[in-house]
Amino acid sequence: FGLSKRLLAAGKTPVAVLGFNTAEDVFYENEFKALGVQTVIATADGSRGTRGFVIDALPERFDTICACGPMPMLKALCAKTDKPGQISLEARMGCGFGACMGCTCETTHGSKRVCKDGPVFTKEEILWPQQP
């Protein structure tokens, strides 16, 4: 939501693609729409918007992706497109300041700590096959 505000202020045209299990789970749709952001909804059961997942509801044309969510969704999303992107990873964090190395992800630059080096990484630097 905050990123959409910044993109709009910079004269960009963001599209928010939001995925949920059911129509009852949908949130933030009205907030994005109030900003003037085109908002696309996908629900796994088809009760609202596109039936399926976020990757099934992607616009045909876009320049870049900025995504957050569960690792399986992020993997599928990044595998589907060759567009550049920024990915915010979720990880269980034992200490929260990088000492325990419990939240590492494998990248083209070696192991990185999600809590200290991230949580945002470029889509291209994440070694997706090595992620949980």
Model-assigned labels for residue ranges:
Residues 1-2, 71-72, 90-119:
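Local cysteine-cluster metal-coordination motifs and their immediate loop/turn environment
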Residues 1-89:
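FNR/FR-type flavoprotein reductase catalytic core
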Residues 28, 34, 106-132:
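Short Fe-S-cluster ligation motifs
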Residues 58, 74-76, 88, 97-98, ...:
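Nucleotide-activated chemistry modules centered on ATP-dependent adenylation/adenylyltransferase
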